[in-house]
């Protein structure tokens, strides 16, 4: 009778064979994501080659940087169209999440438009509200939770990215701009106001926080993504 004990090594073996691509573009903090993947037994390729991205089983779109510069690079290398047309799962991280949105206040930048929401700059309400939002903060997510923002209701849906998680896990953030809670929100965090900590639509996943800097919690999130 199968006991489930083979699940972990079988998944690890599957990850070794997986074709994983990391989008190369004008952004920083790429190599910490590559190292996180390597710790999980994955050998990713860092590329701005459209064909390699299209052939990958999973794509990660991480980075820190400025929205207009990043979008300029994506357009010049035809990566904007490639990312919008991907069929396999892709995970945007930090600015990667923001670039998947419709528009960013950072540099008044038109973005990829995958998520139908605009990226806004944090507006401190109190003296103790510091921008950027930097450090550890908690995730809120539940399949039946409803969150009111500006009078609108949104249903938060379990996407599989947080499989096995309980509410209140801490993850690491560094950002001055945020994605408001929207129809594609799957996790929120409170800082100045509730905002989208993670998004999901079809094969597109995104986190505002850095799973690669979030210790064992972040490792589980990356592992869940690879196993989607």
Locate predicted features.
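Short hydrophobic segments within beta-strands
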Residues: 23-25
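Short acidic low-complexity segments
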Residues: 44-55
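Structural motif
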Residues: 60-62
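Amide-donor transfer/coupling interface in amidating biosynthetic enzymes
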Residues: 85, 118-228
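Cysteine-nucleophile active-site neighborhood
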Residues: 65-137
């Amino acid at each position: 009778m199968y006991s489930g004990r083979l699940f972990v090594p079988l998944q690890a073996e599957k990850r070794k064979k997986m074709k994983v691509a990391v989008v190369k573009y004008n952004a920083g903090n790429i190599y910490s994501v590559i190292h996180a993947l390597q710790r999980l037994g994955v050998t990713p390729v860092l590329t701005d080659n459209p064909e390699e991205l299209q052939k990958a089983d999973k794509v990660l779109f991480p980075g820190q940087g400025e929205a207009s510069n990043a979008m300029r690079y994506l357009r010049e290398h035809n990566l904007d169209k490639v990312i919008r047309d991907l069929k396999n799962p892709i995970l945007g991280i930090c600015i990667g999440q923001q670039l998947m949105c419709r528009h960013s206040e950072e540099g008044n930048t038109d973005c990829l438009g995958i998520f139908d929401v605009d990226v806004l700059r944090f507006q401190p309400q109190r003296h103790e509200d510091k921008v950027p939002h930097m450090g550890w903060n908690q995730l809120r997510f539940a399949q039946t939770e409803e969150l009111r923002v500006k009078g609108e209701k949104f249903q938060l849906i379990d996407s599989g990215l947080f499989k096995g998680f309980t509410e209140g896990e801490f993850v690491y953030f560094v950002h001055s701009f945020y994605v408001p809670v929207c129809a594609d929100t799957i996790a929120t965090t409170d800082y100045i106001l509730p905002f989208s900590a993670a998004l999901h639509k079809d094969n597109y996943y995104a986190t505002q926080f850095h799973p690669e800097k979030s210790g064992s919690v972040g490792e589980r999130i990356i592992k869940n993504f690879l196993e989607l």
